[in-house]
Amino acid sequence: MPTILVILMLGTGMPALGVEGIPTSQIFWAVVSLVLVYTAYVSEVYRAGIESVHPSQDAAARSLGLTHVQSLRFVVIPQAVRRVIPPLLNDFIGLQKDTALVSVLGVVEVLRQTQINEAAAFNGTYYLVAATLFVAITIPLARLTDWLVARDRKRRQAAGVAT
């Protein structure tokens, strides 16, 4: 389900129910929406990481007398975690970009504040500042991801492990 649809459904639908005890804060529902959407993304990344570990790794651990849980804990999961770090950082970059979507609820975040300032001053440089802020966060994260991938590739080649 698209992120904006989840934000709209929860951000407008939940407060409209009028049920006592349910928060009506738009910021609360914006955060809940982003958490729900990105939890689904992250769980898929981890699932793919676990499935990417060759079944022979589990079989070798089981042949050494490890239980299924021990095999997962000591053999499969550590290998999977190494493989999922770059995709997780990509998801984090996507999350940082998707925060601008919460403005549809009226929550004032960076892009919405930029629109307010630009409308008041008729000065387009506010958009330049907002873009610079997004770029200043995104580019270092992208470089970190590239560095981690290159480091992992180098370690695998040094160990003679096929990628």
Which role fits each region the language model picked out?
Residues 1-163:
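Transmembrane alpha-helices and adjacent helix-loop boundaries
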